[in-house]
């Protein structure tokens, strides 16, 4: 796989993640990505961990909505919010700066991509608060 093909696949995956978050379909993310182990409790499935992440995120957005007296949501994917993908031999990394009505939120998403010898890509999602 060329670097360009890898970068295109990575960007497509980030788009899927961000759009699932914007649509509040947190559980769906588990079908194409893992959540960082820091979000997973013992015995918890990836789907359950993504749902818990969604509860946390919804709580943050609700708190800001109440404090600012305007609605806070995560916008759908915007390519301009995607930083350049740091390509390495078998592990790559990218950050995505989510927005609310085009305004950056106070956290960002970190996505790590690992490629095995068969060129299969595994994806790990995290949030930097």
Task: Kindly give the residue locations of the regions a language model identified.
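Surface-exposed, charged secondary-structure patches
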Residues: 53-106
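Amphipathic alpha-helical interface segments used for dimerization/assembly
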Residues: 14-21, 33, 54-57, 61, ...
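Short, charge-rich amphipathic alpha-helical segments embedded
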Residues: 37-55
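Short, low-complexity N-terminal intrinsically disordered segments enriched in polar/charged residues
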Residues: 1-19, 23
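Short, well-ordered alpha-helical segments enriched in acidic and aromatic residues
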Residues: 25-36
């Amino acid at each position: 796989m060329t670097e360009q093909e890898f970068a295109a696949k990575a960007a497509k995956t980030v788009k899927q993640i961000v759009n699932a978050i914007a649509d509040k379909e947190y559980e769906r993310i588990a079908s194409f990505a893992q959540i960082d182990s820091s979000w997973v409790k013992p015995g918890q499935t990836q789907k359950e961990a993504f749902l818990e992440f969604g509860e946390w995120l919804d709580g943050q957005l609700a708190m800001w909505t109440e404090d600012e007296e305007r609605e806070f949501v995560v916008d759908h994917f915007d390519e301009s919010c995607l930083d350049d993908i740091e390509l390495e031999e078998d592990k790559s990394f990218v950050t995505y700066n989510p927005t609310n009505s085009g305004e950056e939120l106070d956290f960002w998403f970190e996505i790590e991509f690992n490629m095995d010898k068969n060129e299969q890509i595994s994806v790990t999602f995290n949030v930097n608060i």
